[in-house]
């Protein structure tokens, strides 16, 4: 994960190590899964193995995840469903559907905001929400559309 994103996550999650680890691990899995499905970037066996290890060993053992399992699991389910929808909507779709896919594919940031809520409550979530959205949607729509055209999204 890029340093500037990690700094925002660290601040949004008030330095809560287990919450930060959870979000970083979830991001690692999401990036690997996306690269496997999109086939737009090479992904080596070590990265695939690491993603599966994180999913099956490290996240289930994470104390933050364990404590908030029933609040977090529906968010992960919704994020994965949105990401699957985005992948389908990108395929030969109208520009409108591609614009919708552009938003759906990055909803993992919503999980960060909910983790912030679990750590600091409503006021804290509302404080960090603009920062999180600033990196959640940092990619520009025109670059995304260009990437779809050239097959590198």
Tell me the role of every PLM-derived stretch:
Residues 1-153:
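All-alpha prenyltransferase/terpene-synthase fold signal
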């Amino acid at each position: 994960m890029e340093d500037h994103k990690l700094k925002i996550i660290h601040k949004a999650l008030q330095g809560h190590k287990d919450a930060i680890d959870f979000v970083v691990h979830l991001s690692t899995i999401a990036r690997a899964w996306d690269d496997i499905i999109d086939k737009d970037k090479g992904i080596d066996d070590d990265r695939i193995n690491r993603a599966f290890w994180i999913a099956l060993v490290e996240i289930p053992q994470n104390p933050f995840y364990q404590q908030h399992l029933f609040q977090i699991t529906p968010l992960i389910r919704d994020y994965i469903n949105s990401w699957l929808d985005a992948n389908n909507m990108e395929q030969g779709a109208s520009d409108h559907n591609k614009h919708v896919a552009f938003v759906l594919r990055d909803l993992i940031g919503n999980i960060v905001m909910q983790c912030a809520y679990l750590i600091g409550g409503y006021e804290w979530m509302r404080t960090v929400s603009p920062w999180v959205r600033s990196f959640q949607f940092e990619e520009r729509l025109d670059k995304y559309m260009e990437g779809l055209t050239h097959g590198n999204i």
